[in-house]
Amino acid sequence: MLTTAKANPLEALRSAKENKELSGQLEHHRSLRAIKLKVLLYREEREAAGVPPDVISRECATLHGSLLRNYMEEAQEARRLGAAELAQKTAERFASAFQVRPGSLGDAFDRRHREVERQAAEGARKEAIERRIVERVKRIKGE
């Protein structure tokens, strides 16, 4: 009697992070393969042209090193941009979660700016008190 174990479909699914990592590894592999293919095609082209093997080996090594260096620089730049983008998104999420209003760095510590805000708030408070007093006086006179 042969029974088949049913796999949990939720366990079969990978997380988005795992998929992104696997996709990155696959892209890395494809890029390295493309570099090797370019070097191989160059080698065949040079052999068909009748160039000596030692010269071909040096040229291919130089080409491979150059292509690999360019790829690594591009990959590093892409990683740096991805990290910066992720940091920006995280900062935006925190800012919205804590209801931080946009402004320049150090606004909260600018004494002149804080003093102007304090004076404006004090003026608004005094105006509100004066309005209430005027309304009371009008009500009292009206009675």
UniProtKB/Swiss-Prot annotation:
It is found in: Cytoplasm; Nucleus. The keyword S-adenosyl-L-methionine does not apply. Associates with the NTC complex (or PRP19-associated complex). The NTC complex associates with the spliceosome after the release of the U1 and U4 snRNAs and forms the CWC spliceosome subcomplex reminiscent of a late-stage spliceosome. Associates specifically with U5-containing snRNPs. Coiled coil: none annotated. This is Pre-mRNA-splicing factor U5-Cwc21. Keywords: Cytoplasm, Nucleus. Its main location: cytoplasm. The keyword Cytoplasm applies. One of its GO terms (biological process) is mRNA splicing, via spliceosome.
